[in-house]
């Protein structure tokens, strides 16, 4: 019998028969009757009988209506345990059967009968798969100090913005140290789990059949015969999964529009029609443009194994302004497009895989504005298909360095924060291995510096300790290239208390860390690019200590901005104690919530940036592997134009847990997409390619494209003297924006047309 056992917080167990205490015994009529039973507008809860994991009874918690923005975000229920003293036990085991499509995440708290629920034990959440069974093993060895494990009175289950979960909870076993897991009913496995697995597989097959039927129908309508292959096309803002659902156009004619110095890309998609395809390539040529300006590469794929602790979003039509609403939905596991294999241009395509090719153009700086014609040729052994390609070059240029100040960490390393024992063992192994990605990149440091600058990034770190943490050679190279952005002199914090000895030690540490990089930056003539970042996400109770640090740092390092993500949402105004802070950085959510305070803060001489990290989740924009490329482009482009942050911060782009860099020509890579905890791509925006060289991703291409769109808006404002507007069709709110590339392009191209029109008007006058 195969049973999925989810082990949380590093507590290893095995499935063998043994005794256990039930915290909630649903076989007891009295205990059944004290459990809540209710029906809400979006969810329902009740005790239910039948054959479950360990007996007749279960507790059913089902979502009856998907969250849509107006329903409760946190449907929840409190179960009442009959056992109140949990101190003898080290594990709590819940058998979970989801009789619905997956993607929702089951969360919980275990707390006392009174007081704040959130002070209870909060185990790692349980992602739900399609129609499946999991055993949720919760570690009870570390209780929060606010919770007395001798007085447990609530076992709280909840979902966040759920879609379709229908969970049957059973077991509720408490295990003492050394006690094995209880057995799982063979009848339950046979009557419930196996049929559910069949339903899940049939659902996947039917979705795939409908996807292929739709795509092939579009190809036929576009005039394709299907001889050898079906050819599709997509923008750079789309993520097209090779073996799962997709929705793309048939290839007919391709186009690119870009300014001088700008990058812009498109995707060509190839699917066999009945027979595997060998040595498939895509070639793009444009008459009158240097062939070296256009490059075709293979789209690579990474495989996610476990559902992530976040949802995605898809826009649905509504009568709201702009005509859309972003609805959250579950994210399937499997193969996702992400790395762009610039060292590979040819591949075999098998079965009904839909293989992507990334066609990227960088417009030469001296290219004449105008319209150009070319072709995209898709070919394999014994066949070839040709499609027209049009290119329009706008009569202006994007800047060499980022149009928005950035503070972003590139410091390759494995995941170690909130790490399990397995994570820490892997980290130790990677650090010791000279061929691991976190070490292999170092011999190509200058190449990485150029590569990052190609994406508007400067090699930097928010958290380094001073002189040795700064890549001085890279910085000076970028200065010479006129591409140098901002860099950090080092991470600072506040004194723990105001005792004289503490303050003396704090000041000594500050001088030891920052005096040398300050002097060197000044000597090299790049001090005007420097900042000092500190007090990462610190709560207000420490603001008096931070205020002291600000006074001292201002004296020691004049001219260097002091920068934080501390939780001052007054941004240095009103009752704020951080009036000496130069740059404040709230999350995108807090920036929008406190937008009325931004202008007063700027009037007082501060800057207000924004940032994302492991949050916010959908419907907000973020950079996870599963999120569409347009989210990164919206965030750095249209949303930045609309909301006007003065900079963007991100904590890390190179958390790499892979054993080896990506190499070879197989698009289905073995790169590990899991980065921070159970997230896919959080803190990890690039991959490491052959021999430690850079490997781009679709996410980072869209990050740069968004900044180039921002440069369009800035050029428009410079030429016209008017603010560049973002219509509601493109972006209505911080969490409501279009996911349609054509809508986005219409706005961006309209800005370009207005720039050229303003230039023509200026010339006439």
Where do the model's predicted regions map?
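Aromatic-lined carbohydrate-binding surfaces of glycoside hydrolases
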Residues: 271, 306, 317, 328-348, ...
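Substrate-binding cleft of secreted/luminal carbohydrate-active enzymes
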Residues: 628-676
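Contiguous beta-strand segments within globular domains
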Residues: 86-91, 251-274, 356
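Beta-rich carbohydrate-recognition modules and glycan-binding surfaces
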Residues: 2-6, 19-196
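Catalytic domains of carbohydrate-active enzymes that cleave complex glycans
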Residues: 204, 462, 473, 494-499, ...
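Active-site clefts of carbohydrate-active enzymes
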Residues: 603-634
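Surface-exposed binding patches on compact interaction domains or structured appendages
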Residues: 206-250, 274-359, 367
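Hydrophobic h-region of N-terminal signal peptides that target proteins for export
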Residues: 9-19
């Amino acid at each position: 019998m195969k049973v999925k056992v989810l082990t949380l917080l590093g507590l290893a167990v095995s499935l063998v028969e043994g005794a256990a205490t039930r915290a909630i015994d649903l076989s007891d009529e009295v205990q059944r009757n004290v459990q809540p039973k209710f029906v809400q507008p979006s969810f329902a809860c009740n005790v239910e009988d039948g054959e479950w994991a360990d007996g007749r009874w279960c507790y059913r918690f089902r979502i009856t209506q998907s969250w849509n923005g107006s329903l409760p975000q946190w449907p929840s229920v409190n179960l009442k345990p009959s056992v109140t003293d949990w101190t003898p036990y080290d594990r709590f085991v819940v058998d979970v059967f989801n009789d619905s499509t997956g993607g929702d995440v089951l969360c919980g708290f275990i707390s006392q009968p009174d007081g704040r629920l959130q002070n209870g034990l909060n185990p790692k959440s349980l992602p739900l798969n399609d129609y499946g069974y999991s055993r949720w093993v919760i570690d009870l060895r570390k209780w929060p100090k606010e919770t007395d494990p001798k007085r447990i009175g609530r076992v709280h289950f909840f979902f966040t913005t759920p879609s379709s979960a229908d969970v049957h909870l059973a077991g509720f076993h408490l295990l003492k140290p050394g006690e094995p897991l209880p057995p799982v009913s063979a009848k339950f496995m046979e009557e419930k789990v196996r049929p559910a697995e069949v339903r899940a597989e049939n659902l996947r097959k039917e979705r795939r059949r409908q996807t292929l039927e739709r795509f092939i129908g579009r190809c036929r309508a576009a005039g394709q015969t299907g001889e050898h292959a079906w050819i599709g096309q997509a923008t750079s803002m789309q993520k097209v999964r090779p073996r799962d659902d997709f929705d793309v156009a048939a290839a007919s004619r391709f186009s690119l529009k870009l300014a001088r110095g700008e990058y812009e890309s498109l995707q060509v998609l190839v699917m066999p029609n009945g027979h595997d395809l060998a040595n498939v390539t895509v070639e793009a040529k444009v008459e009158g443009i240097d062939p070296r300006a256009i490059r075709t590469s293979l789209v690579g794929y990474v495989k996610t194994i476990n559902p992530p602790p976040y949802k995605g979003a898809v826009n649905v039509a509504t009568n709201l302004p702009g005509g859309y609403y972003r609805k959250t939905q579950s994210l399937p596991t499997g193969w996702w497009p992400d790395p762009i294999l610039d060292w590979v241009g040819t591949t075999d395509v098998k079965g009904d895989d839909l293989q992507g090719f990334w066609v990227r153009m960088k417009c030469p700086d001296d290219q004449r504005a105008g319209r150009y014609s070319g072709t995209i040729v898709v070919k394999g052994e014994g066949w070839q298909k040709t499609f027209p390609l049009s290119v329009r070059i706008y009569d202006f240029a994007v800047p060499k360095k980022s149009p928005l100040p950035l503070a972003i960490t590139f410091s390759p390393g494995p995941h170690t924060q909130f790490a399990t024992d397995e994570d820490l063992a892997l980290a130790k192994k990677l650090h010791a291995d000279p061929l691991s990605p976190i070490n292999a990149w170092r011999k190509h440091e200058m190449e990485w510096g150029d590569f990052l600058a190609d994406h508007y990034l400067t090699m930097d770190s928010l958290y380094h300790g001073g002189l040795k943490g700064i890549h001085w050679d890279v910085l000076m190279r970028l200065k010479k290239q006129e591409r140098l952005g901002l860099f950090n002199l080092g991470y600072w914090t506040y004194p723990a208390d105001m005792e004289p000895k503490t303050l003396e030690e704090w000041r000594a540490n500050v001088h030891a860390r920052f005096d040398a990089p300050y002097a060197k930056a000044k000597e090299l003539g790049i001090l005007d690019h420097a900042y000092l970042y500190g007090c990462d996400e610190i709560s207000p109770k420490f603001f008096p200590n931070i205020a002291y640090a600000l006074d001292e740092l201002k004296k020691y390092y004049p001219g260097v901005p002091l920068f934080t993500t501390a939780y001052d949402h007054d941004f240095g105004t009103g009752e704020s104690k951080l009036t000496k802070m130069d740059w404040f950085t709230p999350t995108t959510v807090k920036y929008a919530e406190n937008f009325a305070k931004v202008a007063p803060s700027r009037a007082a001489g501060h800057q207000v940036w924004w940032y994302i990290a492991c949050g916010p989740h959908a419907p907000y924009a973020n950079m996870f592997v599963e999120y569409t490329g347009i989210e990164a482009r919206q965030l750095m482009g249209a949303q930045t134009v609309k909301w006007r942050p003065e900079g963007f911060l991100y904590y890390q782009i190179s958390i790499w847990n892979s054993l080896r860099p990506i190499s070879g020509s197989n698009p289905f890579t073995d790169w590990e997409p899991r980065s921070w905890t159970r997230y896919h791509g959080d803190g990890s925006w690039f991959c490491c390619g052959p021999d430690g060289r850079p490997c781009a991703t679709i996410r980072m291409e869209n990050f740069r494209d968004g900044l180039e769109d921002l440069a369009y808006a800035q050029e428009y404002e410079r030429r016209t003297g008017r603010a560049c507007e973002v219509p509601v069709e493109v972006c209505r709110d911080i969490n409501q924006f279009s996911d349609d590339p054509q809508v986005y392009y219409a706005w961006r191209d309209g800005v370009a047309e207005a720039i050229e029109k303003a230039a023509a008007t200026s010339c006439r006058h």
